[in-house]
Amino acid sequence: MKAIIVLLMVVTSNADRICTGITSSNSPHVVKTATQGEVNVTGVIPLTTTPTKSHFANLKGTKTRGKLCPKCLNCTDLDVALARPKCMGTIPSAKASILHEVKPVTSGCFPIMHDRTKIRQLPNLLRGYEHIRLSTHNVINAETAPGGPYKVGTSGSCPNVTNGNGFFATMAWAVPKNDNNKTATNPLTVEVPYICTEGEDQITVWGFHSDSETQMVKLYGDSKPQKFTSSANGVTTHYVSQIGGFPNQAEDGGLPQSGRIVVDYMVQKSGKTGTITYQRGILLPQKVWCASGRSKVIKGSLPLIGEADCLHEKYGGLNKSKPYYTGEHAKAIGNCPIWVKTPLKLANGTKYRPPAKLLKERGFFGAIAGFLEGGWEGMIAGWHGYTSHGAHGVAVAADLKSTQEAINKITKNLNSLSELEVKNLQRLSGAMDELHNEILELDEKVDDLRADTISSQIELAVLLSNEGIINSEDEHLLALERKLKKMLGPSAVEIGNGCFETKHKCNQTCLDRIAAGTFNAGEFSLPTFDSLNITAASLNDDGLDNHTILLYYSTAASSLAVTLMIAIFIVYMVSRDNVSCSICL
C-alpha cells in the first residue's frame, strides 16, 4: 500500500528594521568648546560682527543732544554754559549727549585762562544731565556783597541783546564802586545758598579777573596777587591770581582786553550751601544751573544723521545685529553689542557626522549596529529622527519634537548669554555713572582691563554652551529611542543601539507616522505567512504491510528507551561510588 506523509512548511517574510539617528550634513561648521577644542557641527549661530565706521546718529527711542543749545547761533557750548549774552536759550532734555567739541574752545566774550582751571569741563558736566535749566534769579546780590559796594563790570566784546556792553549772566564782575573802597582787603567770605528745586544739582559758576599791575591798581587799588577759595560738598579749591605776563592775545581768541579771567564752578547737592572766599577782582556767582537726571556722554561729531541702536566713539552710529562685536574697543552708549577679543559662534545643530554605513547582518536575526558612527542623509526637516530599512529601501523621517527640544536648549543658551550681556552692560553702565561723578576725567577714561575681563567671561560662557549643546545629543537620542519603543510596542523586537526589528513592513508612510507620533501598528500588515504546502510522498509496496511497519517503529522506539534507561542507571551508580569503571588501553 502507499503511505502518505504530510510536510507543513511555514515560510515568514523578511522583517524591516527601524533605528533612531541624527542627520548628516556635508557642509560642516566649526565651533569651540571647553573640553573638546574645535568641533565640526551641522550649523552655527554667529554671535559677533565687525562694524564699519559710520556717521553719528540719534539714539533710537530717546532724545540725543548735540549742541547744548541748538537754537543759539554762533555760540560755542562754553558760551552757552557761561550764559554769554545772545547765547542764552533753552537746553533740550536728552538721555544721551555728544561731546563734539574735541579741543578746548574759548569764549568769544572775554579771554579765559583755560590752563589755570577746569572750566573746559563745564560743558561736559552739563551734558551729563538729562534736564538742565538756568535759574531765573541771581543767587547773590553782587552790588552789596562783602567788600562793596560794587558796580557790575561789562565788556564791549560781550554785547547784550540791545548791543550794549554786557557780561556772562552766570557771573557778576564786582568792581569797587568808588575810590573809597578801591583798596586792598583781607579775604572776604560770601555764602552761596541753594536756590534750585529739591533734588536738583546746583552748578554755581564763579571766577576772578586779573590784569597788569597798572590795571589792577586802577580797578581795585591793589596790584598784588589775590587769593580765592571755593568750597562745596567737602571739595575745596584754592587759587592765587597772576599779575601780568599773560599769553599772546591771539592764543585767547584775539580779544582786545589786556586782562584775563579764570573761571571755575562748584556743584552743590540738594539743600547744600557753598562758600567763596575772595579778595579783589572776584566774579561773584549770579544765575546758576539747576540740573537733574542722567544723560550718557560720548565723544562724537555733528551733525547727527538718522537713528541708530548704539553710538560708538570709533564707529559712530551702529545698528545692533549681533550681541557682540570684534574690532576696536571704545566707549559706547545705547543698545550696544559688547566687545570681545575673538569671533564667537554658538552651535546650532548637531555634531557633524559623515553619512552612516550599515554594518553587515549578524546573528540569527541579522541585527544592525545602528548609529554608532555617522548620520543619515535626507533628514532635512529636523536634526533627530528615524530610518527604516527593508524591501522598500531606506526611508528617513525627522522627529520635529525632539529637534524642537534641541532648538529650545540652544535658545535657552542664547537667552543665558543675553542675560550675561545685560549684566555686563549694567556693570559698564555703572562704571559710566561713576565717571559722571568724576566728569573731569571723562574725556580720557577707558577701562580696558574691565573690557578684557568681560570678554574672557563671555568667551568662556560660549565655550561651555557649545559643550552642553553637543553633549546633549545623547540625551535626545535616548529619549527618542524610548519614544520609539513605546510606539512600536509588541510589534517590534529591540535589537540594540537604537534599532528595532519590526513584525510588519514599515515604509515611508509608516516612518512619517512614527515621526509625527500618530503611528498605529494595527494599520500596517501583521507578519505574513506563505500558504501551507502539502506534499504527498508515495511509498512503494515491497511486501510490507501496515503491521510490519508499525512493528519496526515500535521495536526501534523501545530499544532506544531501554538504552537511555540503562545509561542513566549507570551514571547514577557511578556518581554514588557503587560502580567503578576502568578503561585500559
Swiss-Prot record:
Residues 16-553 are extracellular. The record marks R362, G363 as: Cleavage. One of its GO terms (molecular function) is host cell surface receptor binding. Disulfide bonds join C19-C499, C75-C87, C109-C158, C506-C510. The chain crosses the membrane at residues 554-574. It is found in: Virion membrane; Host apical cell membrane. Binds to sialic acid-containing receptors on the cell surface, bringing about the attachment of the virus particle to the cell. Plays a major role in the determination of host range restriction and virulence. Class I viral fusion protein. Responsible for penetration of the virus into the cell cytoplasm by mediating the fusion of the membrane of the endocytosed virus particle with the endosomal membrane. Low pH in endosomes induce an irreversible conformational change in HA2, releasing the fusion hydrophobic peptide. Several trimers are required to form a competent fusion pore. Homotrimer of disulfide-linked HA1-HA2. Major glycoprotein, comprises over 80% of the envelope proteins present in virus particle. This is Hemagglutinin. The lineage of its organism: Viruses, Riboviria, Orthornavirae, Negarnaviricota, Polyploviricotina.
